[in-house]
């Protein structure tokens, strides 16, 4: 018997059975335990969710801005009240350490919802004078029914990042979580209903991207799709969304981000930043700075500092608050990461740390991979070119600033980048030349609600968070008013 039994769909403010008996398993990657049997939505369920969302959206959009704001703020309060419970469930479902989920996942998701709840009354149009007898005014109106498709690494946080601006702007959202980590998104739906969100305004459909995701992206009455995931899948989602009914899209996709350490940098601080940029959340963060560039003359000293820090990582049971590095999200993903590690060895990179699956003692039943650092890497290696989405750092040496900027930009991705230096002029000079949408100077990884996040090149389209994202969930209606006479040419 699974610990959490059978998980149903969430449609029209309540849990409902899917149209078929098909289910998939939610697995604890730390132990292999089956946590739940999750129902698979059918195409008929998608239609029910769309109809429910259309009804609810009309009610939601008709509310005043302050009414919507109060309901979203109430949801924030409930999220914070239930923080520890939700964090524990997220840890079981994702394998992320409780020391992370308790202080980051729900906290930062609630922060984003609170941010947009405060912006609801600020959605305004413009008044544009034409002449004494005529003017134009604009209205920012909600799109209608939108879709969010989440990734498996930050399930509830991503659901909040996508739903917060959508709901704030007066839309409804149908959310499809990753098949790998579906449990906390269903809890979020409960919380929205408890807070007073009209039925249907936030529905959750569980199932595969190939089926449920496609039915949603191709549905003619969906107005926008916001997707987080890999670039290859993102291109398919974007093509499906645009070819079916010219839907608007936001794509937060993959990355292979560079971290450039300059010769004048504080090497201890740079090593700390590199560790966070590679091993936080067991390396499963889209913005990870996995290509670490270090001046050739500093490479040996930097390697020593990294090895010292890797040795301090506390790998273990993610439910233990002393653990700061848990398993990977699934056994299938573990095998994928291990295949990249094997490729790195084959292509001549030197293993500085890790490089294998952990199987002793409590690790035997879980999807644990040792924090891995490769050095003596070159730009043409597979581990340097392709997104691994695991705890694998590649150290590369360089000689000149011009060279490292060119090499940092030599990638199809452009999600994130960072620079470590004590020279403020150099910091901005380099950052301004890097082709990336999210950049840090002497830091890595923080993504506050106020900060727009998204990528260049193959790393995405549009932005999440920040004021600008709210506008992406509205459309402008322009109205000309004539107060004087009207002259016809006929």
Swiss-Prot record:
NAD(+) binds at residues 150-152, 176-179, 230-233, 254, 286, 387. This is Betaine aldehyde dehydrogenase. Its cofactor is K(+). The active site is at 162 (charge relay system), 252 (proton acceptor), 286 (nucleophile), 464 (charge relay system). Pathway: Amine and polyamine biosynthesis; betaine biosynthesis via choline pathway; betaine from betaine aldehyde: step 1/1. It is an enzyme of class 1 (oxidoreductase). The lineage of its organism: Bacteria, Pseudomonadati, Pseudomonadota, Gammaproteobacteria, Pseudomonadales. The modification Cysteine sulfenic acid (-SOH) is found at residue 286. It comes from the Bacteria. Belongs to the aldehyde dehydrogenase family. K(+) 2 binds at residues 246, 457, 460. K(+) 1 binds at residues 27, 93, 180. Pfam families: Aldedh (PF00171). InterPro entries: Ald_DH/histidinol_DH, Ald_DH_C, Ald_DH_CS_CYS, Ald_DH_CS_GLU, Ald_DH_N, Aldehyde_DH_dom, BADH. GO terms for molecular function: betaine-aldehyde dehydrogenase (NAD+) activity; metal ion binding. Dimer of dimers. Keywords: Metal-binding, NAD, NADP, Oxidation, Oxidoreductase, Potassium. The keyword Metal-binding applies. HAMAP family: BADH (MF_00804). Binds 2 potassium ions per subunit. The record marks 248 as: Seems to be a necessary countercharge to the potassium cations. It catalyses: betaine aldehyde + NAD(+) + H2O = glycine betaine + NADH + 2 H(+). One of its GO terms (biological process) is glycine betaine biosynthetic process from choline.
